[in-house]
Amino acid sequence: MNRFPINHCRVCGKTVVYRLPDDGDTKPRAVCTVCHTVHYENPLNVVGTIPTWGEDGSKILLCKRNIEPRWGKWTLPAGFMELNETTAEGAARETVEEAGAQFEMQGLFTLMNVAKVGQVHLFYRAKLLSDNFDPGSETIEARLFTEAEIPWDEIAFRTVRETLKLYFEDRQTAKFGFHVVDIE
């Protein structure tokens, strides 16, 4: 079950109970005790980019977080997808909000299943058009790093660390694939 359980019906406001719905579902769901509405708890999508700089894509733009969790740690520009936007639109929006970067979107690079916390992380490759950045309020600093310069011990999230490792592996062959990773 969700670590933030549903307590009240979104339709009528009455109390819900977790049980198997009458429709044959095999998982306990939040079911309203009055109007019998079934409430489903679904994963959240986190979307972002791997912004690269240079003809060879040897530098990566990272943002130092100015928010919790993991304040002061480095991450790729990313955040929760909003309603009414595609994954690519959300990734682009987050990159502008967090880094103030100008870039060209490229292909989807990683899909990370983080089932333990009910999230799916998607990262797109992006080619920076400028090395001037205007970080937003969620970012202390936006900076370019080569692979050797990346502060690996200061990376905020495992999904970001794994995405960066896969990027640099693919970069060596100049063939960028699409990677699906399950994070335990």
Model-inferred region functions:
Residues 1-7, 49, 168, 179-184:
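A broadly conserved sequence feature marking short terminus-proximal activation segments
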Residues 27, 42-46, 69-71, 76, ...:
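Short connector loops at helix/strand junctions that flank enzyme active sites
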Residues 42, 53-97:
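Conserved Nudix-box catalytic region and its N-terminal flanking loop in Nudix hydrolases
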Residues 81-166, 170, 174-176, 183-184:
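Unchanged
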